């Protein structure tokens, strides 16, 4: 049996290491979404992590501050290690 431990430092993590990790997010409308993350890079250097197969942005990456933040409409989230 494996135990998932939340990735506590997701706000400062390189977005590339979050690819494929399990994420559980709660939206402002109290909808819970559970799935794996995929990375979308933009030409300006910014990046977005979203659920695979779903177009919802979950995490926004700011290359100027090297930090991650929850996208608009996301109230809380947890990111877990790869299994």
Language-model regions: role of each:
Residues 1-17:
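Mixed-charge, Lys/Arg-rich low-complexity intrinsically disordered regions
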Residues 31-62:
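Basic/aromatic-rich interaction segments and small domains that mediate binding to polyanionic partners
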Residues 2-3, 55-83:
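Intrinsically disordered, low-complexity, charged/polar segments
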Residues 26-34, 72:
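Short coil-to-beta-strand transition motifs
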Residues 15-16, 37-41, 68:
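Short, exposed beta-strand/loop patches in secreted or surface proteins that constitute
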């Amino acid at each position: 049996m494996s135990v998932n431990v939340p990735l506590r430092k997701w706000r400062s993590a390189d977005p590339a290491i979050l690819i494929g990790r399990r994420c559980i997010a709660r939206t402002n409308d109290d909808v819970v979404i559970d799935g794996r993350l995929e990375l979308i890079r933009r030409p300006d250097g910014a990046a977005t992590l979203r659920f695979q197969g779903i177009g919802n942005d979950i995490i926004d990456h700011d290359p100027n501050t090297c930090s991650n933040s929850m996208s608009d409409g996301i109230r809380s989230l947890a990111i877990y290690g790869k299994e």
